Every structure is written in structure tokens, then in C-alpha cells.
Amino acid sequence: MAAIQGIEGVISQLQATAVGARGQETQSQPTMSFAGQLHAALDRISDRQTEARVQAEKFTLGEPGIALNDVMADMQKASVSMQMGIQVRNKLVAAYQEVMSMQV
């Protein structure tokens, strides 16, 4: 039964794509502004860092069920998320500076 539901989901996606290709409007979900998406991404980065810190604290306190490899994986994920956020910021600053240096 789950396979049928999965197939129905794929079929509905294909139908939505076909309607979009014909130029007809579909019931679209509300889109988030750029600032909203940026804020949500920063919140996800912050949440990931908080989760990694909490995992590390639990491991340090010796709570059962917290393995070192899980802590290290969470900390690495938080680090990669932060590096990605920094790179996005750098690209945004570079794009802003380029636009500001254009002559009108």
C-alpha cells in the first residue's frame, strides 16, 4: 500500500510539472522572501551548533547512550554549516560591493 502512495505522489508531481510546462498557473505555496530565507538559514546554523554543544556537554557528563563518534559527527556538521554560512556571507558582500562599484 505504501508503494502505491509513493507512486501517486510521483504522478501528482509529474502532473504539476506538465501543467507548469503548459503555462497554466498551479496552486503554488507562498514563497519566502530572500531575507526570510537568509534568516531561516541562519537559524538552522545556530540550531545545529546548539545541538552539537548540547551533545558534547552530555558526553562530557557521561550520560549513557551518547557515543564519541556521534558527538564528533555533530560537531563536524556544525562546523561545515558555519563554514557554508561564512562563504555565503562572503559571496553576498562581494556581490554587494560589485553592484555598488558599478557606474550608473
Swiss-Prot record:
Pfam families: FliE. It is found in: Bacterial flagellum basal body. GO terms for biological process: bacterial-type flagellum-dependent cell motility. InterPro entries: FliE. One of its GO terms (cellular component) is bacterial-type flagellum basal body. Keywords: Bacterial flagellum. The keyword DNA-binding does not apply. Disulfide bonds: none annotated. GO terms for molecular function: cytoskeletal motor activity; structural molecule activity. Belongs to the FliE family. This is Flagellar hook-basal body complex protein FliE. It comes from Salmonella arizonae (strain ATCC BAA-731 / CDC346-86 / RSK2980).
